[in-house]
A protein has these predicted regions:
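Active-site substrate-recognition segment that forms the wall
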Residues: 107, 115-123, 209-211, 217, ...
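C-terminal catalytic lobe of FAD-dependent flavoproteins
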Residues: 307-309, 314-424
């Protein structure tokens, strides 16, 4: 992946200026080698550096090249699986730990932004929008469940109230989370990378990890160098490839498509989202959108299984945008791109250890902006010998996709077709 540039996205076009970073050449020795300079890797590196570890980060392309620099930019707390489903699959102590941690990622982001003065257009407020009474009942139930874990900041919105925060007639109500919000995701990653370097960490770009030499003193090999470490953190997620085959077997890269309009102007933008909150609906195959600092609308949705890039992203997403906001029918689309996320069969993150010294976290299944920041803290705690929260994730049950890697894409696509049909029929 030598000299791999960022995709032609709005985020890349509006990224903060950063100095070039070196390619790994020769041999380096460190305490922890982190594979991947996305949110999981950068969050892990920051927590470790703050606790006295020497850290080297290997990035196959550029900081935030993958999902961390392409996502919708929404700070969505909790997990991709509802907490009541988690409660039924694990014991009460494990469920309690997972429930307590579910909103921590958003707090970590805000702490990082404040501590390191990261310029990433942070805004408070996120809305889950209900398209029908079943969705609304589900939001009411989830609010009650989250309150049991101490998350009392959630506010139900009736049909009148949701019209005050989003000018879309499709919604019957919603749930407002002021601990949610939105950011410029690539600039958040770039700011975190700068924080890593300010603490003495090293980041090598265009340095693909091609092989991990396991053992008591593991070594990560690249084309032009190698890193000897006491510990390794594997944080490649959907862009890891087959570097660790046992991780690839239980997950699948999937693509989501995003478009960005031309600037709308202050007046039109304010009519769409008067409070400047971000929004996602409650469908299984959901749509999500928000405004940018320069008053564009970013709108995303859809899933392409197997990480294939569709030929015409605008043709897929623009009709979804116009269904929500028909008044934008004459607005030009300036950017369109795909970003991959890593799906697990359970839709819960996979966290664990390979041997005694290789740690990993992957498979956010669409809730990566917040979860990855929590994961970095949990991984760092485990390396310091405090593994209770790590174990709460590591003990979650996970299963390979039926049919293995060959059949996982059609299997998942069939499931998505079923849930998409349910969305259309309002089930």
């Amino acid at each position: 992946m030598a000299n791999t540039p960022y995709p032609q996205s709005y985020y890349a076009a509006s990224a903060n200026a950063v100095p070039p970073r070196p390619v790994l050449q020769g041999e380096v020795e460190t305490d922890v080698c982190v594979i991947g300079a996305g949110y999981t890797g950068l969050s892990s590196a920051l927590f470790l550096l703050e606790n006295g570890f020497r850290v080297t980060v290997l990035e196959a392309a550029k900081v935030g090249f993958g999902a961390s620099g392409r996502n919708g930019g929404q700070i969505v707390n909790s997990y991709s699986r509802d907490i009541d489903v988690i409660e039924r699959s694990v014991g009460p102590k494990q469920a309690q730990l997972l429930g307590e941690m579910a909103f921590e990622g958003g707090r970590i982001i805000r702490e990082r932004v404040a501590k390191y003065q990261i310029q990433c257009d942070l805004k408070d407020g996120g809305v889950f929008a209900a398209l029908n009474s079943k969705h609304m009942g589900h939001l009411e139930s989830q609010k009650r469940l989250w309150e049991r874990y101490g998350h009392t900041q959630l506010e139900l919105l009736d049909e009148r109230r949701i019209r005050e925060v989003v000018a879309c007639d499709n919604y019957v109500g919603g749930l407002l989370d002021m601990s949610g919000g939105h950011i410029h995701p690539l600039n958040l990653a770039l700011g975190e990378a700068a924080a890593v370097e300010s603490l003495g960490g090293t980041i090598y770009e265009q340095s693909v990890a091609v092989r991990i030499e396991r053992g008591a003193n593991p070594v990560v090999h690249t084309a032009q160098g190698k890193v000897r470490a006491k510990f390794i953190i594997v944080a490649g997620n959907a862009y890891l490839g087959n570097l660790v085959p046992e991780l690839a077997a239980k997950s699948m890269p999937c693509g989501t498509q995003v478009i960005t309009t031309a600037p709308l102007g202050d007046e039109l933008a304010k009519t769409l989202l008067p409070q400047d909150y971000c929004v996602e609906d409650c469908n299984y195959l959901l749509d999500y959108y928000r405004l940018t600092r320069d008053k564009r609308l970013i709108f995303g949705g859809g899933v392409v299984y197997g990480a294939r890039d569709p030929a015409n992203i605008e043709a897929i997403i623009r009709p979804k945008m116009l269904k929500a906001f028909p008044q934008l029918k004459d607005v030009k689309i300036d950017y369109a791109w795909t970003g991959n996320f890593l799906l697990t069969l359970s839709r819960l993150p996979q966290v664990g250890r390979l041997g005694d010294n290789i740690y990993y976290s992957q498979g956010c299944s669409g809730h990566g902006v917040t979860y990855t920041h929590l994961a970095g803290k949990v991984l760092a705690e485990a390396l310091r010998g405090q593994a209770e929260r790590f174990d709460a994730f590591a003990d979650l049950p996970h299963y390979p996709f039926p049919g293995g890697q060959l059949l996982r894409t059609p299997f998942a696509a069939l499931g998505a077709w079923y849930y998409g049909l349910r969305d259309k029929l309002g089930f």
